[in-house]
Amino acid sequence: MRAFSTLDRENETFVPSVRVYADGETEDNSFSLKYRSNWTPGRFNSTGAKTKQWHYPSPYSRGALSVTSIDQGAYKRSGSSWGRPYEEKAGFGFSLDARSCYSLFPVSQNLTYIEVPQNVANRASTEVLQKVTQGNFNLGVALAEARSTASQLATQTIALVKAYTAARRGNWRQALRYLALNEDRKFRSKHVAGRWLELQFGWLPLMSDIQGAYEMLTKVHLQEFLPMRAVRQVGTNIKLDGRLSYPAANFQTTCNISRRIVIWFYINDARLAWLSSLGILNPLGIVWEKVPFSFVVDWLLPVGNMLEGLTAPVGCSYMSGTVTDVITGESIISVDAPYGWTVERQGTAKAQISAMHRGVQSVWPTTGAYVKSPFSMVHTLDALALIRQRLSR
């Protein structure tokens, strides 16, 4: 908001007015003019309802208009008074009450409504919904941390699956690379299972990390009513030309109008209970010498199930939202010559506006939305694809 004064203020301007008679006499009628230069209608605010989990947003409006005389101009006329001819030069002597300047801008008289261009309104509504449907929204701390853990789980799973696949195919140099081990290592065993067992100091810590990330995800308990937020702001500059009836004047307005839409919603899908029924064995507790080489496939299956659950689309329920319109700008007013006068220099004034109005939106901008899971990152999907393709039997 532009920092206009919140108090009503008067301003003062000097209006020159000098009459010169043909006989050389000069008559100075210059004067000072006071006018209301600032207008701030009362703020409108209301308190939103509260629940234990949520404080609903409330409508709010405020605004300010100011007007400043830039130049009273120079106008002249010829005439006579009691038979004495004269030439007179004067400023216009106009004053604009700031309360009457709202017509220079696309706003209502009390500044609680701003006329937003339809293209801006449509774009803001469409793009905020795109953020929801594409999963591009504020996740909240708990979900953001869980997303980071899911990313770690996927990365480590990819490494393990690729190492397992390379070993199964006899490509031991590549398997060593995936396990971050020395590629020149010499193996004692000639059998695949034996060589894989020799590499347990590479894949066993990796499996332990996978287990840790997996268990961390299954232990996360999100609130049932966890608000998430999507925001989009769109603005444009507009120009307006027009006429005032009093004083007779042209005006040129330039202003910026923006619309900001905020949507609060929550994911209402049961999958965010984190598939707690799934289990995964601690790799440190397994006697690997006693299990078949292919056990790694069975061990990774719950990880695949979790990744599949995390990446599935989830439903959303609308909580509340706000639509905030803001206008800032100015208008230059150029005053015509009064009847019987000619213009040497037009009188000008400048009006400025700064206003905002926030309304509450109780429904989706369009019909309901589905979101892409916040865990649907590329490498998460890669890990899921690897488990499905390379470990299938």
From Swiss-Prot:
Post-translational modification: During internalization, MP is proteolytically cleaved into two fragments allowing translation and replication to start.
Location(s), subcellular: Virion
UniProt entry keywords in alphabetical sequence: Host-virus interaction, RNA-binding, Viral attachment to host cell, Viral attachment to host cell pilus, Viral genome circularization, Viral penetration into host cytoplasm, Virion, Virus entry into host cell
Membrane-spanning segments: none
Biological processes per GO annotation: viral genome circularization; virion attachment to host cell pilus
Gene Ontology cellular component list: virion component
Subunit structure: Interacts with the host pilus.
Primary role: The maturation protein is required for the typical attachment of the phage to the side of the bacterial F-pili. Binds to sequences located toward each end of the genome, hence circularizing it. The RNA genome-maturation protein A complex is released from the capsid upon host receptor binding. Maturation protein A enters the cell along with the viral RNA.
Family: Belongs to the Leviviricetes maturation protein family.
Protein name: Maturation protein A
Organism: Escherichia phage MS2
Underlying gene: A
